Amino acid sequence: MTQIDYTRAAKYFLLADFFKGFKLGMKYFFAPKVTINYPHEKGPLSPRFRGEHALRRYPNGEERCIACKLCEAICPAQAITIDAEPREDGSRRTTRYDIDMTKCIYCGFCQEACPVDAIVEGPNFEFATETREELYYDKEKLLANGERWESAIAHNLELDAPYR
């Protein structure tokens, strides 16, 4: 003789699991929407966000890059090419600083390796192009990016400073 489990039978016939699921569905149906209207609204970015590359300058206008080539050496995708020559005062500066953005994997190693914070990955993530050639960044393009995003880059580096 089998014993009947009345609690289980009541749950089955009264559709308890169905109504639990229905209640959960209605909770999310009437909850406020979390989707943002992207082109018109933008979500917050982390200070560590790695976007479009930029070369920075010192406040006096001199470029920061000292041509140590650490970023070129550490780049796992070999996307960075640097040529440099010494100046009359003995310091070295780059004559060519190219980044092939089609190769770049946005790992951030170049930014971490740079001893003077010359190369950084800025907050810009909207840099789609129509041709492949526009993704080959030269020194002038990188310096222009640095000038355009300097305030945001400096703010993000300041926020990230305790963790570096």
From Swiss-Prot:
Signal sequence region: none
GO cellular component, one term: plasma membrane
EC number: 7.1.1.-
Gene this protein is translated from: nuoI
GO biological process: aerobic respiration
Binding site for [4Fe-4S] cluster 1: 65, 68, 71, 114
Binding site for [4Fe-4S] cluster 2: 75, 104, 107, 110
GO MF term list: 4 iron, 4 sulfur cluster binding; iron ion binding; NADH:ubiquinone reductase (non-electrogenic) activity; quinone binding
Subunit structure and binding partners: NDH-1 is composed of 14 different subunits. Subunits NuoA, H, J, K, L, M, N constitute the membrane sector of the complex.
Keyword set, alphabetical order: 4Fe-4S, Cell inner membrane, Cell membrane, Iron, Iron-sulfur, Membrane, Metal-binding, NAD, Quinone, Repeat, Translocase, Ubiquinone
Sequence ranges assigned to domain 4Fe-4S ferredoxin-type in this UniProt record: 55-85, 95-124
Membrane topology: Peripheral membrane protein
Required cofactor(s): [4Fe-4S] cluster
Origin superkingdom: Bacteria
Family under the similarity heading: Belongs to the complex I 23 kDa subunit family.
Location of this chain's protein in the cell: Cell inner membrane
Functional description taken from the UniProt entry: NDH-1 shuttles electrons from NADH, via FMN and iron-sulfur (Fe-S) centers, to quinones in the respiratory chain. The immediate electron acceptor for the enzyme in this species is believed to be ubiquinone. Couples the redox reaction to proton translocation (for every two electrons transferred, four hydrogen ions are translocated across the cytoplasmic membrane), and thus conserves the redox energy in a proton gradient.
Cofactor binding remark: Binds 2 [4Fe-4S] clusters per subunit.
Source organism phylogeny: Bacteria, Pseudomonadati, Pseudomonadota, Alphaproteobacteria, Rhodobacterales
Name of the protein described by the UniProt record: NADH-quinone oxidoreductase subunit I
Membrane-spanning residues: none
Catalysed conversion reaction: a quinone + NADH + 5 H(+)(in) = a quinol + NAD(+) + 4 H(+)(out)
PANTHER family registered for this protein in UniProt: NADH DEHYDROGENASE [UBIQUINONE] IRON-SULFUR PROTEIN 8, MITOCHONDRIAL, NADH DEHYDROGENASE UBIQUINONE IRON-SULFUR PROTEIN 8, MITOCHONDRIAL
Organism: Jannaschia sp. (strain CCS1)
